[in-house]
Amino acid sequence: EMSASLVGSEMCIRDRMSPEPKERNTLSTYRMTFAYIGSFVALLLFMPMVNYFKQGHSEQYGWMMGVVIIAVMCAALFYGCFAWTRERVKPIREKQSPLKEDLKDLLHNKPWWILLGAGIAALIFNSIRDGATVYYFKYFVVEEEYSVISFFGVSFVLSGIYLAVGQAANIIGVILAAPVSNRIGKKATYMGAMMIATVLSIIFYWFDKGDIALIFAFQILISICAGSIFPLLWSMYADCADYSELKTGNRATGLVFSSSSMSQKFGWAIGTAVTGWLLAYFGFQANVVQSEETIHGIKMFLSFLPAIGTILSVLFISMYPLSEKKMKVITTELELSLIHISE
């Protein structure tokens, strides 16, 4: 996590590459698409690499070499990112402001607070669904009754396939985010996706353990909705940086994005903790036949509980004030300020 935070500046550069909101949507879409593709590729290739390198060695060596290969690939891609991107948007004030002043400006940035709440709620939604998947398939669906599927020499049970399908559907959602938001706006797209995810999540509760086709179909639809919101969030964070620069003269792009990234990790941590607490509350005990109350609780993890997260996210984003029309005004005023300074 610490190394990921150190290289997280690639998230901050998008608002410096273009001042146009639609172009930022496209940049965010590319970024999130390849992020999900990278995760999907790593999921498929990691175990085959472990199996290859452990031949003639220990399994520990195989895992270590798998991590080394992934790390080298990541380093090369990060260097490529920074070598082949350019900052084209000039700030109003070239002089770097003190961190204390940046923090003060951030705390007075109302749109950022709204996105903070929406992002945390969205991550709670995601983390609860993903965190409970193994329990849902092991104790409710009883995946042991189904055949194991092998792919690239790796055996996948139903829960693994379910998560992989969700990851692939996330990519579809990311790709759809830019064209849809460019047509109806980021706020409307975000709210629409989360409201659809809410309805689908609630319906999910009533599936029987034999409704495998429906379970996977709804996973695809919900994951498309979930995937579409994150490029929109990052694009809106860039708008928050513009808003802050216009109001204070201080852009503080790095702080806006790094604090937002931290808040999303916070949301994931909350969702994971809630999953553990509620499993204990519903009387869960590992590797035994679960009671009816516990099964009810496990079903809640993939239905009503994540729906609470989506509803909270919709409530937050409904208050977001930076519409496309408002951003055009902000962008124009920033450009006029730069012209005035240059004269």
Describe the residue ranges of each PLM region.
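Single conserved hydrophobic/aromatic residue that forms the stacking wall/gate
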Residues: E1-G8, I13, I339-E343
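Hydrophobic core of transmembrane alpha-helices in multi-pass small-molecule transporters
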Residues: S5, S9, L214-F230, M236
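Glycine-rich segments within core transmembrane alpha-helices of 12-TM secondary carriers
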Residues: S28-M47, S260-T275
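Juxtamembrane intracellular "pre-TM" segments in multi-pass secondary transporters
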Residues: V89-L116
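Pair of pore-lining "gating" transmembrane helices in MFS-fold secondary transporters
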Residues: P111-A132
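Short amphipathic helix-loop junctions that connect adjacent transmembrane helices
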Residues: A132-V157
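Helix-to-loop junctions at the C-terminal end of transmembrane segments
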Residues: G173-K186
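C-terminal ends and interior cores of transmembrane alpha-helices
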Residues: I196-G210
